[in-house]
A protein has these predicted regions:
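A short alpha-helical cap/connector motif
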Residues: 1-95, 101-179
């Protein structure tokens, strides 16, 4: 039940901010729930990277028809090792879902991911950062995003908590957008 509620909540979030975006860009593929949601929402191109080999292989098998069509682009490894190559596939404003915090591994790639987006020539993507404030200081994340474009505005969307996070944190996703 939690997974279906979580998937519904995520689909509502992506649908709300899809606007005219045709490209969905994700760090942290996990089981491919967001990739499937992006396909269901009819994004023309879905780009995702996963650091865990088992999850990557699961998703590669699951989405092979879309990979063959060039609609889904999956990468295996650390997002920061692939960001520049992945961003070459982005030729228009896109919806970014930054959820690349690996299970059981210290550190988080968010700062480097945002730096790569900052160096990309397009400066008006919609960026959603998962799990604020579980992993980050929201003001620091906002400041980093404003380095990309000082016109970004921010909204905090209520996220459906899973597992033990429900008892510890009120969990939010940070949405940065250009009005």
């Amino acid at each position: 039940m939690i997974k279906s509620n979580h998937a519904l909540k995520r689909k509502e979030l992506f649908s709300k901010y899809k606007q005219n975006h045709n490209i969905f860009f994700e760090t942290g593929t996990h089981h491919g729930f967001s990739v499937q949601i992006a396909l269901d929402l009819e994004f023309d191109k879905v780009i995702s990277v996963e650091i865990e080999q088992d999850y990557f292989l699961e998703c590669f098998d699951k989405f092979i028809p879309y990979i063959s069509q060039g609609k889904v682009h999956l990468f295996y490894g650390d997002s920061n090792a692939w960001m520049d190559r992945m961003l070459k596939l982005v030729e228009e404003p896109s919806l970014f879902w930054l959820d690349g915090h690996p299970d059981g591994i210290s550190g988080d790639p968010l700062w480097e991911e945002l730096e790569s987006i900052k160096n990309h020539p397009i400066k008006n993507h919609t960026i959603i950062v998962d799990d604020i404030p579980v992993y980050f200081n929201s003001k620091e994340v906002e400041d980093k995003i404003l380095e990309i474009n000082p016109n970004y505005q921010f909204i905090y969307e209520d996220a459906l908590n899973e597992g033990n996070l429900v008892d510890v944190y009120k969990n939010y996703d940070l949405v940065a957008y250009i009005p």
